[in-house]
């Protein structure tokens, strides 16, 4: 049961359960933790009381503490012994029972926050109170709102850290990916103006890989996302506001990931759902796309497409669609990511 009420009591007070675990504090004090119902039942004589992630003001005028601490209910009694590996072994939330057995790690933070605080508020409106309000609002998102987002998705993951302007999450690789999309959407809606953005790195690791290395390597992916620059059709240049997906050379804008890569992955899954050549085709296609600059790659891809869709009623249409995606550099990058996502989703667990 979650402990969300923390009471500081005098050691000499006898009206609470002495067998209850406690933490000794200086000056003859002790810290006890309760769930809300048990606290109300016991009603200890307190010096001070704190509530975690609750707006409740009826518990002895408690001090509110906000903390991003979402932890999935894995229904595994040995979770404390197995650690994070439990999430790799869990079936992903949106792809039940399928996919590679891997951990996903998400690291993200707000872009250009120093500039926002320095010049984001017009000079004539700048004040200490407005700056403090901006800081508090961002902190509230990463300490309180983040829990609501992950609880709504029931994602198989755990927050390692979330506060200030950044976060670090570990869990089932697929759930981490979908959670990242939800977090970005929620942050955009929370800020309301599109000026504040986040960049992120998403890594995928074996369950036995050292957690410190996961953090470091995913941090490098986050740094790669911070370097993202794209020139738009109207001549404007967009920077950051991006995500590095598994590799530092696979950086996409959030819109590309959610509006191109993810829908394309689902389209690919639909196309190959009843195609026995599906998985083998995908592996070969990814290899050709990664080496598309080689002269022989384009003809080989055309041949592979023709053979793979042989017998399909809409063979010509499918071949044209895949070949057109491969012929454009940005579309090709999105296609590779979608194919990799699909392969990881259908690969045998192990």
Walk through the language-model features, giving the residues of each.
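Charged, helix-rich terminal subdomains or tails
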Residues: 1-350
């Amino acid at each position: 049961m979650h402990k969300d009420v923390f009471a500081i009591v005098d050691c000499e007070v006898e009206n609470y359960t002495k067998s209850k675990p406690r933490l000794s504090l200086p000056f003859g004090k002790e810290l006890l933790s309760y769930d809300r119902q048990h606290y109300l039942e016991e009603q200890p004589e307190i010096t001070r009381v704190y509530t975690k992630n609750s707006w409740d003001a009826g518990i002895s005028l408690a001090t509110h503490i906000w903390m991003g601490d979402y932890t999935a209910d894995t229904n595994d009694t040995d979770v404390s012994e197995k650690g994070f590996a439990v999430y790799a072994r869990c079936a992903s939330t949106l792809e039940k029972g399928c996919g590679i057995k891997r951990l996903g790690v998400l690291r993200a933070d707000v872009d250009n926050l120093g500039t926002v605080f320095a010049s984001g508020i017009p000079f004539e409106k700048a004040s200490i109170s407005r700056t403090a309000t901006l800081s508090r609002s961002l902190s509230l998102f990463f300490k309180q709102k983040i829990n609501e987002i992950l609880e709504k998705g029931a994602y198989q993951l755990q927050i390692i850290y979330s506060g200030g302007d950044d976060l670090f999450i570990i869990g089932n690789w697929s759930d981490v990916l979908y959670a990242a999309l939800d977090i970005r959407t929620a942050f955009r809606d929370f800020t309301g103006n599109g000026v504040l953005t986040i960049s992120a790195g998403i890594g995928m690791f074996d369950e036995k890989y050292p957690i410190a290395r996961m953090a470091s390597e995913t941090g490098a992916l986050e740094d790669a996302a911070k370097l993202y620059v794209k020139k738009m059709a109207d001549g404007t240049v967009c920077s950051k506001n991006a995500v590095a997906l598994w590799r530092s050379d696979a950086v996409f804008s959030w819109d590309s990931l959610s509006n191109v890569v993810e829908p394309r992955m689902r389209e690919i899954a639909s196309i190959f759902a009843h195609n026995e050549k599906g998985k083998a085709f995908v592996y070969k296609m990814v290899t050709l796309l990664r080496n598309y600059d080689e002269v022989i790659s384009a003809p080989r891809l055309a041949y592979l497409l023709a053979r793979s869709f042989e017998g399909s009623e809409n063979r010509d249409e499918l071949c044209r669609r895949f070949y057109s995606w491969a012929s454009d550099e940005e579309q090709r990058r999105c296609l590779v990511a979608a194919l990799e996502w699909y392969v990881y989703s259908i690969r045998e667990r192990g």
